[in-house]
């Protein structure tokens, strides 16, 4: 989340009113206070002080930066959009209450999702006015997977979460011609056919340590219909493996996920301080030495 303030005790309060603390030596902030936790009603949601999506400071210099990348580099221009609806509603309600709403209070669940998405869509619409004609990829992240399962059953996902994701992907296509990159950690194998139907072009981060997220399975079932972005394990391999093991896994991923194209080499998630530098170098140097086995050109 952007904006916010540092509280006297060192915690960070963001523009949504969510308070976080950053543990020593960690690259992540951890949730500490959820402003809409507990017993609330749709009226409480309507009265909540939402961020101002029209604040011009959000967009200052945005077009200039995108234009420079487009005209002066050979990079793809990626816009990191703010459509983290599941995340943000979890942060506002707290995980326990969010799951209770998902299971038993659908009116409240939808009221919060509607309010949050309205703010996010206006933020992004204003951004697209600045850079919608320049971006090659619109990326957004919203975790709907856990280590061993999705956040909810497939029928519940389709009833309560997918309709909002459809509004998001439609919003992106309405304002840009960009490819859509979607980030979700965890075991989301069951949802991938729906992601494809929604028009998502690439899935990140391919958490290979999660259940049913084996690269072979994903490439066999979904290769050619969605691209994969990630796959180098950050839970076990990078922090605990040897440089030789990292290099071997990168080569294997080129053979599996990279076969025929449709894969971007990347670590599954942020590389933490306990990862030996030698392993980071092994990942990048091996990646540079490998070649994608692209699909054969049509005759």
Model-derived regions, located:
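A contiguous, low-structure linker/loop signature
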Residues: 2-51, 72-75
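Active-site loop segments of alpha/beta catalytic cores
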Residues: 13, 22, 45-299
